[in-house]
C-alpha cells in the first residue's frame, strides 16, 4: 500500500511547492519590469526626451544619459513608466525647427563644473494601431 502512494505523493508535493513560490507571471493591467534595452522602451524614452525638450522652458536642450528603470502596463495599448537621467547640453533652443532626438543626443555636454543632471519620471502611452504615442505624465528634479 505504501509503495502505491509514492507516485502520487511526489507530484502533489511538487504542486504544493510551486503554489508557494512568488508569482512571476504578468498580471493583466499590472506593472511589469522591462529591460531598458527593449526596442519599445527605447522608442518610448526617445519620445519622452523629445517631448520634455518641447514642453520645458529651458533655454538649452537636455539629452538622455540613461534609462534607470522601465516598467510597462497593458492598457488600451501599452503604458511605459520610465525613470531616466537627462543632462543639459550646450545646444541652445533657437527659433525655427526644433531638434529631433538623434540631433539632441549628438549635442555636446558643458564642462563638468557646469553640468546639470535631472532625474525624470515619464509615463508614455503607446497605441501603435492608431499611430499614436503621447506623454501622459512628467516630473523632473
From Swiss-Prot:
Lineage per the UniProt record: Eukaryota, Metazoa, Chordata, Craniata, Vertebrata
Site residues (Reactive site), renumbered to this chain: 29
Localisation per UniProt entry: Secreted
One GO cellular component, as annotated: extracellular exosome
Taxonomic superkingdom: Eukaryota
Domain Cystatin: residue ranges: 29-129
Function: Inhibits various C1 cysteine proteases including cathepsin L, papain and cathepsin B. This protein has no toxic activity and its function in the venom is unknown. It may play a role as a housekeeping or regulatory protein.
Gene Ontology MF: a single term: cysteine-type endopeptidase inhibitor activity
Record flagged with keyword Disulfide bond: yes
Family note: Belongs to the cystatin family.
Name this protein carries in UniProt: Cystatin
SS bond partners: 91-107, 120-140
Entry keyword set: Disulfide bond, Protease inhibitor, Secreted, Signal, Thiol protease inhibitor
Amino acid at each position: 500500500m505504501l509503495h502505491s502512494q509514492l507516485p502520487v505523493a511526489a507530484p502533489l508535493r511538487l504542486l504544493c511547492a510551486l503554489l508557494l513560490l512568488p508569482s512571476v507571471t504578468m498580471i493583466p493591467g499590472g506593472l511589469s519590469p522591462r529591460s531598458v534595452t527593449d526596442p519599445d522602451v527605447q522608442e518610448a524614452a526617445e519620445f519622452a526626451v523629445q517631448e520634455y525638450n518641447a514642453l520645458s522652458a529651458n533655454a538649452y536642450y537636455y539629452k538622455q544619459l540613461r534609462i534607470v528603470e522601465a516598467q510597462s502596463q497593458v492598457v488600451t495599448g501599452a503604458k511605459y513608466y520610465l525613470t531616466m537621467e537627462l543632462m543639459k547640453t550646450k545646444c541652445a533652443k533657437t527659433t525655427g525647427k526644433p531638434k529631433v532626438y538623434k540631433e539632441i543626443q549628438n549635442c555636446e555636454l558643458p564642462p563638468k563644473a557646469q553640468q546639470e543632471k535631472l532625474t525624470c519620471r515619464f509615463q508614455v502611452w503607446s497605441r501603435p494601431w492608431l499611430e499614436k504615442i503621447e506623454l501622459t505624465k512628467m516630473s523632473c528634479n
